[in-house]
Amino acid sequence: MMRIGLLGFGTVGKGVYELTSARTDMQVVRVLCRRELQLQDAEVTHDFNDILNDTTIDTVVESIGGLHPAFEYVKAAIEAGKNIVTANKALVATYYDELLPLAQKMGVHFRCTASVGGGIGWLSELERVRRIEHIDYVGGIMNGTCNYILDAMARMDLSYEEALGRAQALGYAEADPSTDVDGIDTWHKLIVSSNVAFGVSLDISGIPAAGIRNITKKDMDTFKKHGLLCKLISTGKCTDGVYSAYVQPTLVELGAPEAAVPMNYNLITLKGDVSGRQSFFGQGAGRYPTAYNVVQDCMDFLNGRGFYCSYGEKVAVNNEEKRAYYVRGAVDAWLQANADETWGEAIVTKPVSVQDMHNWLKEHPNAFIAALPEKTL
């Protein structure tokens, strides 16, 4: 029987405990929790060392979130020879280059299926696909909070502030929504997805992210006039050994699959050179969808399955591919030189490199950009 040390007893941790309690092949035996807690089948501790030094615990499930002390706990557990399951996309994306080689060196298993797509099982599917074919694209709608806000603005004719307020009232958005609306959550998920899909370790310093914070109702009205909707889209590509990766608001045609994704749902897509386009739809968060894939990872350990791919070489990101952009909120000489037409108060650019557009946005943080549609994958 697998003996589990559970770090954290919040939304995900409680779900993991409930799902494993009904099983005979695994058991949560110790739980790290800051608050006072009584559990029938597990010992509750405030000291991580109680889990670390328990030699009967073979697997640690990290569900405390954030970078610290999650990183220190996970690293110590790996060094102690314990398998790791985590749903913490920030942890995996930020410390991929340290934790993955360490796990392989120590001969322990490491999986994080729930870190991208919640209950969708996206990373496990990437693992299966790449056994047979080359994956040249991953991406799509990876953040339910942003999708809810954009969907509410489009369907209910709300302002950004009104849509955000509804998302917060429903529990889809935090009191401080920055990680979601600034694209950071999607950025983390794209990094993990791209590394698994392409079997490399992308240089994350070269991956830009633009969010939806500055979008307005007037922007949405303009998009509607042109038969378009706005979605926050992640893009990772591998073309002839050249890697690109970025997160940005993107305009999609009404008939595109992404346009039909409602509320807080995700739609994540891969494109392989044999099977073509495959898309995966579902809720990207929640207690049971997320806990479900944590337990699936534990079951994979029982069947001898470790990480989704071997740790790959460090590679640079090249975002020189060209896209046309809708830009509103700032104007300078570079933008005027690359203007193609105007949509109301906004400029639509000629095709410019993704990197140049994001560099421009860094200098004009109050502006809003959205890439125009590109050819269907």
Task: Please provide the spans of the model-predicted regions.
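Rossmann-fold NAD(P)-binding glycine/threonine-rich loop
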Residues: 71-74, 89-127
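Glycine-rich adenosine-cofactor-binding loop
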Residues: 3-18
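A conserved regulatory-domain signal marking ACT and ACT-like small-molecule sensing domains
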Residues: 298-300, 304-377
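Conserved anion/nucleotide-ligand pocket segment
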Residues: 128-193
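ATP-dependent carboxylate/acyl-activation modules
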Residues: 257-322
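NAD(P)-binding Rossmann-fold cofactor-contacting core
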Residues: 22-40
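Substrate-binding/catalytic subdomain of NAD(P)-dependent oxidoreductase enzymes
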Residues: 164-260, 265-267, 286
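ADP-ribose/adenylate-binding Rossmann-like module
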Residues: 65-66, 77-95
